[in-house]
Amino acid sequence: LTAACRGTHLAHCAPQAVLTWYFECPLSTEPAFASVFSSCASRLGDLGTAPLANGQGLKSTCSKLLGIVLMLGVAVGCDGRSTKAKPASTIPTEFAVGRSAQGSGAHLPVPLPEQRRQAQANLGFAVELLRNTAEGKNAVVSGFSVSLELAMLSAGAQGDTATGLADAAQFVLPQSQIHDSFRHLSQVVQRTLRGNLSLANAIWIQQGLTPKHAFLDVLRTQYGAGVFPLDFEHDPGGAVATINGWTSRQTRGLIPMILQEGALKPETKIALTNALYINAAWSKPFDATRSMPLKFWLSDDASKLTPFMIDNEREVRALASPGLDILFLSTAGGQLETIFMVPKLESLLSFEKSLSAARITELLKQAVPMRALVELPRYTVESSTSLKAFLRERGASKMFDDRANFKGITDETDLCVDDIFHRALVRVRESGIEAAAATAAPMIIPISGGRPPPTVMRINRPFFFMIWEPNSETALFVGRVVDPSN
């Protein structure tokens, strides 16, 4: 790559292969590496016109996966007209490769009061989104990633379209502050979870369409978004393959595809993508030799044997009450908390309907440090859904039809959003939030004389869970598990 950048072997360099290598290289998120690649992007020509190479590239094999979210928004020309593709991209060179909005420095930025207000609103939005996802079944969503994507989209929205989008997304800050707020929250999350989290944003634009510098500048500086040209008009299938390839690389192959064949149309002009990859281990891993099948109660009179992870004595934060149990499990260094809420006197559906950001915040304050015997089921939860109906019902209907105003993106054609797809996956295992383990009879630790027995925290009924970054007070994922064996 260095040789190519110096111009010594450009004649033998396939640009799409270099781009593939760049995205698959484990070092590609390092600022110095990104700077080198950015400096030679224009010399490699139009990086987005050809499908990415299918080489396996360099892949990290040591990561443990906690969860992934990927969201895709697709904008099409609402006037039905298409623009003639040009042989080369009109995207300015300086926007050819995204630059990180993470910032630098060893100190964590402290969220300002207005940013905490937006984080609280994001939590309320996430809970509402979960309520509208696969009711009564296992489900998981990343409200944070959805909110981030909608904030990116809002950078190009104007008039009633911008107002409706902000209302539906529960943005509590004015447009002039919303991008700074999300940049700041993203910085806190990324710096806190450095080495455990990868956050990637990209915008894919029809070749020949000239986006406004102001729009691209917001996406580049506030969201670190890469901007790439694609030929939706003449090769929508190739565009699907390219975006799916990006998806697979950003999610380390866990989500190999988000777009089905035919999902992109010749009328498509812009696609926004966002991927969140988390890798974290428990502060104290569960001993796999103690894991065993136990009953998980699907209802008061029906149960199913399910693999459970068991720790006979663990220091936790928890709330044990007649009506509700809450358990906090931390990753190494306390950087991330997975919070489990188990209602005992009402159904999970009823409990979920009563949840709000304010109630969750109040419940979290009631948890106290304690010693506990923990029984937690192993589980994997995955959800894939369209957000179009959800956002329409909440006031954002104009952005999906010919009333949409996205003149902040371009004046060359009328744009509207075709659909927004959201996919999320979370795995919980003994070592952290992944990894397989054998099961065997548990070993019981005897209680020393005079010491009270640990509180039993048994997550053996349908439960609500939340993956929480405490420094920014951001819910990265919220979900429900009604049957961990399903």
Task: Go through the PLM ranges and name each one.
Residues 463-486:
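C-terminal or internal capping secondary-structure element at the end of a domain, subdomain, or sheet
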Residues 22-23, 33, 37:
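Aromatic (phenylalanine/tyrosine) cluster motif
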Residues 136, 175-344, 361, 365-453:
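Non-catalytic, conformational "gating/processing" segments within enzyme and secreted inhibitor domains
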Residues 28, 35-42, 60-63, 82:
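Serine residues within intrinsically disordered or low-complexity segments
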Residues 19, 54, 62, 66-73, ...:
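Detector for small/aliphatic-rich hydrophobic stretches
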Residues 9-12, 16, 22, 56:
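Low-complexity, intrinsically disordered or signal/transmembrane-proximal segments
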Residues 10, 27, 38-45, 51:
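Short, low-complexity, charge-dense intrinsically disordered segments
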